[in-house]
Amino acid sequence: MEVFDLGAEAVFDPARHVEKILGRIGGGDVTVACWEPGQTSPYHCHPDATEIYFCFQGGGEMRTPERTVPVRPGGAVVHPPGELHEYVNGPARSVLFRVRYGTDMRTFVRSWAANPEWQARAEDRAYFNPG
């Protein structure tokens, strides 16, 4: 059994959201993800992993190519393998509990509009623009 106190594990950074892996269990990991107001994740996917977010406090919006949904305390969002998504935090600090599991945790980033320093890696370009 693994037990976590998400409030005590929370770490915030004014420059970028923080993803702190709390443990690796079986074929996945569990993470506390901490967001300052207005922070945005990269627009990304995990081709071989399912990613589940549970909102502990705060909230914002989760976006996919198909839709945008509110993320509120007590709510959860499940991204199947390969689904492009990004999280946009709302006006308050947020703490999300993330569970990822699958055969490979690799992340491919399509874009990161909120991070002007971000540059695509060769593997990101190859994944999104094959051939």
Describe the predicted segments one by one.
Residues P37, D48-A49, R67, E83-L84, ...:
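A generic "binding-loop/recognition-motif" signal
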